[in-house]
């Protein structure tokens, strides 16, 4: 077996298979596992912290190194955070809203402020199957 095939076989064990179909422009809510030190019980405490924002870039989601970059505005300051999608520290990714965009990367949102950063909502038709 070649080394590349061996590497891809090992990496496939760690890929998450329950990821939603994420697109650039989506507003997502990412649940990240945070480990805190507890001074009273001298142990570690775990909790899930949610980070909500607009996906401005995607990179290789089918790969073990797949990332999403999420941007949000907090107290007038833009904050971007990059998440490894297949990391065990990512507990959940929920899509809140889908937006219609015409670019693969939304880096131009960095220069915009206020209402100019709004994206047009994309309507999704839900079909009901009748058997």
UniProtKB/Swiss-Prot annotation:
Keywords assigned by UniProt, alphabetized: Cyanelle, Plastid, Ribonucleoprotein, Ribosomal protein
Listed InterPro entries: Ribosomal_bL19, Ribosomal_bL19_CS, Ribosomal_bL19_sf, Translation_prot_SH3-like_sf
Protein name: Large ribosomal subunit protein bL19c
PROSITE patterns xref list: RIBOSOMAL_L19
An annotated GO cellular component: mitochondrial large ribosomal subunit
Organism from which the protein derives: Cyanophora paradoxa
Ranges annotated as spanning the membrane: none
GO biological process, alphabetically ordered: translation
Superkingdom as given in the UniProt entry: Eukaryota
Its biological purpose: This protein is located at the 30S-50S ribosomal subunit interface and may play a role in the structure and function of the aminoacyl-tRNA binding site.
Name of encoding gene: rpl19
Family per record: Belongs to the bacterial ribosomal protein bL19 family.
Pfam families: Ribosomal_L19
Subcellular location: Plastid, Cyanelle
A GO molecular-function descriptor: structural constituent of ribosome
UniProt key word Translocase: no
